[in-house]
Regions:
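N-terminal cationic and glycine-rich segments that engage phosphates or anionic surfaces
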Residues: 1-61, 67-68, 72-116, 126-133, ...
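Active-site phosphate-binding and catalytic loops of NTP-dependent enzymes
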Residues: 11-13, 121, 141-149
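A generic local structural motif
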Residues: 49-50, 140-146, 166
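Short hydrophobic alpha-helical runs that function as membrane-insertion/retention elements
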Residues: 62-65, 85-88, 157, 177-182
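Short gly/ser/thr-rich secondary-structure transition/capping motifs
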Residues: 136-143, 159
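Conserved acidic residues
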Residues: 153-154, 192
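Internal active-site segments that recognize and position negatively charged phosphoryl groups
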Residues: 154-172
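Short glycine/threonine-rich loop/turn motifs
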Residues: 166-203
Length: 203
């Protein structure tokens, strides 16, 4: 709990920006700011970590999602370290609910990468090589973090669900459990494993 305190995990949003469904996790309000109950934060963090460990132990793929600037580097680093897919740019509609199409685009990206590595781009006309190179870079930018995803994930981990609403909606629609940070402006009902913390203090 001390670690949570040191990173400022207890500071919520301004009281006027709160979601009433977060009331059970709020300890107090000071100077117009809601203060989260760190005892409950620590409890729910452990529950969420146990769920993630169980999913991983069962061989489930966990998709990490966090497009806000301060979340991008930690998400990419931790997901890569764990060998899991991630989304740190824009969430594209249908990334989960229309995964067949997304998988086709990932396959195209992999095919273009193979052609590039084989030196095919070097023997094309400059115009054609540039066209395919641009297409490859766009695919990498949009989907590069998802290259490990061969089927819909078994769990989704979201930083700031208030920003990643579409990701949570798609996961819920497919019955995929969602772990997510729950700041005081978040609707925790969209999370099977809410972690009540300040998601603006990513560490």
């Amino acid at each position: 709990m001390r670690d949570l305190l040191e990173v400022g995990a207890h500071f919520g949003h301004q009281t006027r920006r709160w979601n009433p469904k977060m009331a059970p996790f709020i300890y107090a309000q000071r100077n117009g700011i809601h203060i989260l109950d760190l005892a409950k934060s620590a409890k729910h963090l452990q529950i969420a970590l146990d769920a993630v460990r169980d999913a991983s132990a069962n061989g489930e793929t966990i998709l990490f999602v966090g497009t806000k600037k301060q979340a991008q580097a930690p998400i990419q680093e931790e997901a890569t370290r764990a060998g899991q897919p991630y989304v740190i740019k824009r969430w594209l509609g249908g990334m989960l609910t229309n995964f067949t199409t997304i998988r086709k685009r990932l396959t195209l990206m992999e095919q273009l990468e193979a052609r590039e590595q084989a030196g095919e781009f070097d023997i094309m006309s400059k115009k054609e090589a540039s066209k395919l190179g641009d297409k490859l870079e766009k695919l990498r930018g949009a989907l590069g973090g998802m290259r490990r995803l061969r089927k819909a994930p078994g769990m989704v981990f979201i930083i700031d669900p208030s920003r990643e609403t579409l990701a949570a909606i798609e996961a819920n629609k497919l019955g995929i459990p969602v772990v997510g940070t729950a700041d005081t402006n978040v609707n925790p009902d969209q999370l099977q494993y809410p972690i009540p913390v300040n998601d603006d203090a990513i560490k």
